[in-house]
């Protein structure tokens, strides 16, 4: 009897040890380190180069930028989404010109995808717009911060998640990396996606939107160790808490809620692509470092980007996505958003 009990205890111990070794490591610390200022700079010098001709919606320059994004996803073995035939969500000119008639040609959202290991049908969206305002009076508006910074952040976040996946620590939920077009003409790419989603909006648990995170504004001349968070608590207390906790555990930026005030006259909450998710009841957070003297000017160039700050803000977006993708429950919608 004693011998039988002894053998049972040994077997149970071995079983527990085996189970522990197969548990996914929920700590993203080692993958945070793969997001670097150096890599962000390398990507941004391409995305915000004169060759891209200011990335006007539907232009040949924007299509070159899209080609570069796709080449990087392929290099990192991040595929296009299940259910899609390639990396493009094609948007007809008829949709892009329906409201403002800016005479835009056909354009595309660019998407990439990492499938979740346990809840693949639940989707975390990470979005950034890759269009800018093109060439004006012979000057190329390269939009290094707006939104080259968010565009390259998505590439680095995808690379970090893919590295984790290859090491057996892939996300439990699926992640859609969504580079939207037409933001500068009225959030058109995200509007098209929200009306023609590849995955049901009911299965989309959150959107993390990244738009202009590469500089500092007049309110933070003494330090760039901050980021504005907008909208995290509008629909979901859970999302607000996730953002706060992820920052405290891993990044330690100053989270500034100045523009989270619904009475703020700038109305930034309504001016970037997360809004097309939020208005459909999807918890959303907008990461932003504020406006500066080069906003929508030809002087928004790569040499003015603060890459150490861009690195930390990108790392924060990654950790928020990590928490959303791996926590037990999706964030509860417990507020109206109004």
Predicted regions, residues:
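Metal-dependent peptidase/peptidase-like ectodomains
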Residues: 180-284, 332
